[in-house]
Amino acid sequence: MTTWARSLIRISTYEVETLQKRLAEIGSRRASAEMRLAVLDAEVEIERERARADAEAGMLLQAYLNGWKHRKSTVEADLGELEAEEEGARDALTGAFEELKKFEHVAELSRL
């Protein structure tokens, strides 16, 4: 195998590894956002139960719900952005992996 082929394969492998790490990081951020959304949903149920049990808490429930809706829409927007970012990262990883396989194939053919 020639030096240039080894260099191309090494660079392509590094790019694939970097993109895999990026995809894992995006997945972690997405899981965190999904957890925040689940926590928000659980919190609103707790507040609704508290409002049913306590008249004073019931009067404050509407203000809480307004804030909750805002926080929920923010998290949902973050999730939408993360989904788009994840799709882009997957596409980039697919392309980088295809390039790596092309270089490996050319190197194998040049060895024969």
Where are these regions (language model features)?
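Charge-rich amphipathic alpha-helical interaction elements
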Residues: M1-L112
